[in-house]
């Protein structure tokens, strides 16, 4: 009887152990699955939230620095009249002209390409990392990323050369580095491509407008009305900017033709002035030649008259003897 009771009790304990083991195993698996799912959901939620957060952060930075919405460039440059026309386009809040070109810096064989621009006004505001903004001709502000590589140091001289120094648009080559900066136009490590040197731009620099020897702007930056209220990279923003871009392109043909006629007219006027100067020069030379011939003829006549007088004098002297 006792034996049966012990066996029954053992079976009961075994059943309880089995049930407890199953319950514990299920609980552990459930908890593991729960945490795996929770981790996946959290990771997915983080990824989902990262894009809008990054977009909002970038948009806030763009608004603070007044990053351009559109950039306009012309092969014949942009005149003050072109800037006025751009500012009159419906949807354009502000248009600013500037000067920009790619230059070479460093020793031959290891030259770097630097994108050099003039300091702007309200658009594409720079953030000074160290030093200050250039205040006069011969000073420059350097890309902080480029300065961090050790190629350019505060207070040192940076030499910028164009591909054709004989036809340079810069008034001087040497510039004193007075500060380093970051620009809203460059948000990645890459600085763009170029036709100079290695084909890659190493960094950028800014100088005052009076360092450029040009009559017209090489680039114009535009802000679109209402773009600040939209979030960058969204469909609403893209559609708004595209409408303004379409209107800007609508005046392109007229402005290009006016600029072409202006350049052509100036060239023709210079040619006409040159031809007139050449004709006047020929006329003057011809007149001077004729005057010289007359003077020579008069001198020859005077010489002959003098010789005749001399011979008469000699003859009279001979007759007197």
What are these regions (language model features)?
Residues 3-321:
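Membrane transport/envelope proteins' first extracytoplasmic loop
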């Amino acid at each position: 009887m006792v034996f049966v009771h012990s066996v029954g009790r053992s079976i009961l304990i075994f059943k309880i152990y089995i049930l407890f083991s199953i319950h514990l195993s299920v609980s552990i698996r459930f908890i593991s699955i729960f945490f795996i799912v929770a981790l996946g959901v959290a990771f997915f939620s983080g990824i989902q939230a990262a894009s809008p957060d990054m977009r909002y952060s970038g948009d806030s930075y763009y608004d603070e620095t007044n990053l351009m919405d559109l950039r306009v460039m012309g092969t014949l440059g942009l005149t003050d009249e072109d800037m006025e026309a751009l500012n009159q386009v419906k949807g354009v809040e502000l248009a600013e002209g500037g000067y920009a070109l790619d230059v070479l810096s460093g020793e031959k064989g290891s030259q770097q390409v630097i994108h050099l621009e003039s300091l702007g006004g309200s658009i594409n505001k720079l953030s000074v990392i160290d030093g200050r903004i250039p205040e006069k001709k011969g000073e420059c502000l350097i890309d902080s990323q480029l300065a961090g590589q050790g190629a350019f140091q505060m207070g040192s001289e940076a030499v910028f050369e164009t591909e054709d120094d004989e036809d340079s648009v810069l008034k001087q080559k040497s510039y004193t580095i007075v500060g380093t900066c970051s620009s809203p136009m460059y948000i990645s490590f890459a600085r763009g491509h170029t036709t100079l040197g290695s084909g890659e731009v190493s960094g950028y620099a800014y100088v005052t407008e009076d360092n450029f020897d040009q009559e017209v702007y090489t680039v114009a930056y535009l802000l679109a009305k209402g773009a600040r209220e939209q979030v960058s990279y969204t469909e609403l923003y893209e559609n708004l900017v595209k409408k303004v871009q379409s209107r800007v392109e609508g005046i392109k043909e007229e402005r290009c033709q006016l600029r072409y006629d202006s350049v052509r007219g100036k060239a023709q006027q210079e040619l006409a002035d040159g031809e007139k100067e050449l004709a006047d020069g020929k006329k003057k030379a011809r007149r001077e030649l004729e005057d010289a011939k007359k003077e020579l003829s008069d001198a020859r006549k005077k010489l002959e008259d003098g010789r005749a007088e001399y011979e008469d004098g000699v003859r009279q002297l001979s007759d007197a003897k």
